[in-house]
Amino acid sequence: MGRRPARCYRYCKNKPYPKSRFCRGVPDAKIRIFDLGRKKAKVDEFPLCGHMVSDEYEQLSSEALEAARICANKYMVKSCGKDGFHIRVRLHPFHVIRINKMLSCAGADRLQTGMRGAFGKPQGTVARVHIGQVIMSIRTKLQNKEHVIEALRRAKFKFPGRQKIHISKKWGFTKFNADEFEDKVAAKRLIPDGCGVKYIPERGPLDKWRALHS
């Protein structure tokens, strides 16, 4: 018996049901890698960031997330080179979906009890996504803007419902606006730290400020 189609589990009807000591025997999620490309690139190398944003409250299967990840990665490698971008899948499939298996062979009515004891066995995992939640993000160089939009457009076809592509005003994966990012780095208000930054507040011990500006 094959896998039940994901359209049967599209809508968020029940409470979140994660894997736990009460919910055992859950199959592994299909998606295992959430960061692709040049993920160790410094924060100042990839200023442009594009997001795929959900426009529906629904459930996305781990198989769909894996298919979208592969699709976006393949296009970005072809168009920008394998070291020209960093993709991050922002959803993790923690919600367990169940199936109450029904026999369809002859004499099945003697072997099974129908809807008596119908609480199913774990079948797979899905990610619950809200309206306005980011599904996938890509950071890259400024000249690759069209390639980011096309990669996310192709990945959209792997999901049900409606998604929007949004080019962020922030610098890379940080929460700081691109137009003031470089000024803050020059003023030592932000310190680059891998693919993110450390924010140095104006208040605090004076010796910390002296150590930074010495």
Swiss-Prot record:
Found, by tissue, as follows: Testis-specific.
Molecular function via GO: structural constituent of ribosome
| Swiss-Prot/TrEMBL GO biological process terms | cell differentiation; male meiosis I; ribosomal large subunit assembly; spermatogenesis; translation
Output the InterPro entries linked to this UniProt entry: Ribosomal_uL16 (IPR047873), Ribosomal_uL16_CS_euk_arc (IPR018255), Ribosomal_uL16_dom (IPR016180), Ribosomal_uL16_euk_arch (IPR001197), Ribosomal_uL16_sf (IPR036920)
Pfam families per record: Ribosomal_L16 (PF00252)
Key words, A-Z: Cytoplasm, Differentiation, Meiosis, Ribonucleoprotein, Ribosomal protein, Spermatogenesis
GO cellular component annotations, sorted alphabetically?
cytosol; cytosolic large ribosomal subunit; endoplasmic reticulum; nucleus; ribosome
CDD domains annotated for this entry?
Answer: Ribosomal_L16_L10e
What's the chief localization of this chain?
cytoplasm
- Where does the chain cross the membrane? none
Q: Where in the cell is it found?
A: Cytoplasm
Q: Please state what is observed when this gene is inactivated.
A: Spermatogenic failure and male infertility. Spermatocytes show defects in the transition from prophase to metaphase of meiosis I due to impaired ribosome biogenesis in late prophase spermatocytes.
What does the record note on quaternary structure?
Component of a male germ cell-specific 60S large ribosomal subunit (LSU), which contains RPL10L and RPL39L, instead of RPL10 and RPL39 paralogs. The composition of the rest of the complex is similar to classical ribosomes.
The Swiss-Prot or TrEMBL record describes its family as follows: Belongs to the universal ribosomal protein uL16 family.
Explain the purpose of this protein: Testis-specific component of the ribosome, which is required for the transition from prophase to metaphase in male meiosis I. Compensates for the inactivated X-linked RPL10 paralog during spermatogenesis. The ribosome is a large ribonucleoprotein complex responsible for the synthesis of proteins in the cell. The male germ cell-specific ribosome displays a ribosomal polypeptide exit tunnel of distinct size and charge states compared with the classical ribosome.
The cross-references to PANTHER family, in alphabetical order and at most eight, read: 60S RIBOSOMAL PROTEIN L10
Q: What is this protein called?
A: Large ribosomal subunit protein uL16-like
- Organism listed in the record: Mus musculus
Print the organism lineage. Eukaryota, Metazoa, Chordata, Craniata, Vertebrata
